[in-house]
Amino acid sequence: AGFRDSFTLFGKKPIEKLIYLNCNIKETVYNAAEKVINSNAECIVCMDDKICCQVLEKFQAIQVSVPKDIKLVSFYDSYFLEHCKPAVTSLRFDEANLGIIACEELIGRIEQRTYSSRVYTGYKVMLRASTR
């Protein structure tokens, strides 16, 4: 996953036992959130807004305070994260443009044209209360 590349770029090593991927149902998200909070992690990074909202829900149920006890961020910004209590720091990007670029790359590969192995799109960090 790309987030692992960022660790390498900054000379860091992720704590693998604290990485929970494929949390597709609320119960697995809740279990992962509880394990992370019990490990004394500083921050949770969620892959999307739905998972992030579920983490917040779990924390409220077990009286964990964001950002006092743990910080919370998401790779995907949405209206919901902007209006959560607390509002969640996230990445905002142009979804339509990303879709266009992805389709162009796929068509290029299908037609066996030259394509990029990596495509960079713009994004903006929406710094909010969950990390302050």
Task: Identify the residue ranges that each predicted region occupies.
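Bacterial carbohydrate/catabolite-sensing allosteric modules
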Residues: 1-132
